[in-house]
Amino acid sequence: MANLNKVMLIGNLTRDPELRYTPKGTAVAELGLAVNRVRNNDQGERIEETTFIDVTLWARQAELAQQYLGKGRPVYIEGRLQMDTWDDKNTGQKRSKLKVVGENMQLSLIHI
């Protein structure tokens, strides 16, 4: 059976992109994205839920994000899910976090 790992998100940046470079000179940008979902509860009241997602962009996409995006700006991200794991320096415990590795980014002209 074939596998598929694809994510498509439209949301607003929660902070300015943080750009850095690897020792080999590859650009990496870290973004925070807030994605809103509106639904009705059992009483018919409208409820807005926000999901906060960390996104990593690489190479030219990272540089473009740093150049054109800022906190509050709407953006479309296509990418894949990736599990990051590390050892907590304070407790020594293993930690993990699901994030999105962006493979395509489009600036949105409308504010979400």
Q: How would you label these PLM feature ranges?
A:
Residues 20, 106-108:
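Nucleotide phosphate-binding site architecture
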Residues 43-67:
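A beta-strand/beta-hairpin structural motif
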Residues 3-6, 30-32, 54, 85, ...:
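Residue-level recognition of specific faces of alpha-helices
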Residues 3, 9-49, 94-96:
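Core FKBP-type peptidyl-prolyl cis-trans isomerase
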Residues 110-112:
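Conserved small/polar residues in nucleotide/adenosyl-binding loops
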Residues 11-13, 33, 71-83, 102-105:
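OB-fold and OB-like beta-barrel modules that bind single-stranded nucleic acids
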Residues 58-94:
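Beta-rich strand-turn-strand
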Residues 6-8, 52, 72:
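Intrinsic-disorder/low-complexity, polar/charged segments enriched in Ser/Thr/Lys/Arg/Asp/Glu/Gln
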